Structures are given as structure tokens and as C-alpha cells.
Amino acid sequence: NHWLNDVASSVSIFGAIDESVLSTVDYIQSSAGISTAVYVTRLTTTIQDPVSSANHIIRYTYRKNTSGQAQINLVVELRQDYVSEAGLGTLIWTTNHVNIVSSVQTTAAVTLSAVEADSITAYSSLYLRILSNQV
């Protein structure tokens, strides 16, 4: 596994990001020296279709350990029906953070467009896919 929790362990990694209220005490991190690291997590299965295109918000935080000099890029994707890297499912939304420079946690809060929200057909099968690239 190329992702670790806040104590540099790959055991119980989901426990570091499973809160419903933001906590910066625990987190996940890509392993040092890895050119590309992919982490995928399924969103809670209790999400119900809100029958609305409004207020579909994705929130996450990111930062860089500035002790390393390498450029770090981060890609965050919302996917539906992800199975594996060979079966990525449907891309609903994506963003790129190029050349992260700050060691201070930055909070991203992205509201899906109506078109993106309406393209979700299975709320019980949504995944966040995170790619860390060291350049």
C-alpha cells in the first residue's frame, strides 16, 4: 500500500478519514519516494438520492510535507461504480492540485454542478479516488 495513516501505518487507514466532522488530528499520506500513489475509498452507503441537483458538496484537506523537495501534484476524483484500477467506473467530477507547496492544511470544498450531480445514478456506489504524483 502506498498510503499510510498519520502514524505511518497502513493498518486501519480508513479510520484516519472516516469522520463526519472534519478532524485534522488524523489523516492519510502518500508514502515518500513513490512516483504515483492511488487511494480509493467508498463513500458511506447510507447516502440517499436527495432528488435535487443542489448542494452536492465534496470536502477534503491536503498539504505537502515540505521536508521533501519534489513537486507533488494531487488529483481528486468522484467516481461511481469503481471496481478496480482496471474498472474505474464513471467519472463524475475531478480536480487537479498542481505543485502543492504549503505544509499548512488547505481545505477544499467543491460544489458539484447540476450536470455533475444529475449524472449520479447510484448514491450507494460513490467513491473518492485520490492520486498523488511526485514529479
Enumerate the predicted regions with their spans.
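Short beta-strands within extracellular/lumenal beta-sheet-rich domains
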Residues: 24-51, 108-112
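Short beta-strand-plus-loop segments that form exposed binding edges in beta-rich domains
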Residues: 129-135
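Short glycine/proline/serine/threonine-rich loop/turn segments at secondary-structure transition edges
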Residues: 49-53, 116-125
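Beta-strand acidic-aromatic groove motif in beta-rich domains, primarily in extracellular
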Residues: 67-78
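Flexible, small-residue-rich N-terminal segments that precede or flank a structured functional core
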Residues: 1-38, 94-101
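A short beta-strand element within beta-rich, extracytoplasmic domains
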Residues: 37-68, 128
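Extracellular carbohydrate recognition and processing domains
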Residues: 88-118
